[in-house]
Amino acid sequence: MKHARRFSFGLIVLLPFVAGLSGCVTPLGRGYRFDQREIEILPVLSDPPHLHVLVSDRITNIGNQPLDSLVAEMPAGPTFGMQNLRVTVEGEDAEPHLIPAPAVRLYRIPFDPAWTMSEASQQHSVVFEYDLAPQPGGRGTISVSADDYHLGDPTAFPVWQTPAGVFSKGGRAPLQMTLHVEALPGQLLAALGEEIVPGKNSSTGERVFKIATDDPTPYVVAGRYVEQVVSASGHTVAFWTFAPLDAATAQTAAHRLGASFETFDHFFGSAPPGTNTIRIVETKAALPAEFGVAGEPGGSSFPGGVILDARTIAGGLASESGMQLEEYELARTWFGWMVRPRPEAQILMGRGVGLFGVALAAEARGGAKERQQVVMEFLSRYEEARTKAADRPLIEPATGYTREQRVSSGYKAALFFVALEDAAGNERLRRAMRHLVRATSGSDVGDDELRSAVEEETGRDFGEFFRTWLNHPGIPAEFLKRYSEDGSAVPTASR
């Protein structure tokens, strides 16, 4: 039965330490050291427009036996139309073998000849080359046009899988990483990392960024934008739009965004490096709405920033619906970028946490009454969505879900976190979420890690709570009773 397996949250912290100790002695299993990664992203304005991606890795065999292959997770799902994949090993073409797996695309990369143990100090070259193109039905994390382009998705680049085995070594983060991107003439550009080759003096438009090992996945946004910078709520907010914003609109939006970002920083943990400036970026691509009516404008995210459909800008950047969309995407800086939800937890830990962030920001802004209003709004939207598609279990890959199923399950996931906050208490859940981000940053997480963190902070068993919410359809009657139509709510734990 789900959740029968339990472990201490402290084990999440101890396991990397124990694994590190084994590096001091003779290796006991297969393994590799991920020495270096260099990523190049080039916009190609062909028909159809796409991004050409070149990923060059350097890897060393540090295990106790030869390595004849490694497995890499590649971009998959409706967001990407990955085409023209080519892999070379030591400069020679290698035929990647697709491994059947639910919700992810795994390839086994063969090494011929195998990397022997005698080459323990020798770095080996593996190069991936492929094209990414926006696809209908995707989340809008990639776009390419003559005026702008962006790539903001944690799953856009190969992810090496540690070999199977108790004593195996590996990891997804390289010791060194650089990002090469191109800004077309007249474009503003933002990317992850510290710029080491300034692009203003470059005749080619190439920009090079050095990425720290504890940074999230690389991203890039670029376009021929008008920049408006506003300081509000202790933060700097930069608006990159194709036409100037009304000054009052920009000021109103910046004030709320700065306050909301501060709330997330307090509740989820310190924001990643490079997010001192919050960026709100317009794109000419039609981004699909994850919630609301099909065909409405949506958004996307990158660490410390939001990408908005031009229709959202035109419809009111500082409107309530626009601000909630921006807060939802900003919250995904933590759960989506810093912490990557596992495939079966994408709706719970991705959409659910993002919408829960909207409720957190509302309470910080207007107290319990404002939070109550947002929760009632979520509940109403959930009930409306259920008339079109019943919600699914919150822990399973969303592969094959209809849009309506994603919407109803997404709102239920948000209400789960509201109920969890009521049950655990605001301060204890805050500590649990901060510990979760700190201990698992850069890793895949799911409901097991969340439950362990909450139980560690509260000293209580949340097994039945998780089973009721995650495995069964509908909203528990106890929650509906507390959040009745008259607007009253009776928390079960001190806030």
Q: Which stretches of residues belong to each language-model region?
A:
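Solvent-exposed beta-hairpin/edge-strand motifs
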Residues: 68-94, 174-186
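Asparagine-centered strand-capping/turn motif at beta-strand->loop junctions
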Residues: 59-63
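Solvent-exposed beta-strand/loop surfaces of large extracellular or lumenal domains
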Residues: 27-29, 78-116, 137, 288-296
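Extended, low-hydrophobicity, Ser/Thr/Pro/Gly-biased non-transmembrane segments
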Residues: 100-101, 109-115, 125-225
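N-terminal, polar/Ser/Thr-rich
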Residues: 23-52, 484-489
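Acidic/His/Gly-enriched intrinsically disordered linker/tail segments
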Residues: 298-299, 321, 345-423, 440, ...
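Beta/coil-rich, acidic/histidine-enriched accessory regions frequently appended to metallopeptidases
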Residues: 28-30, 53-58, 83-90, 131-137, ...
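Juxtacatalytic substrate-recognition/specificity segment
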Residues: 55-57, 226-346, 357
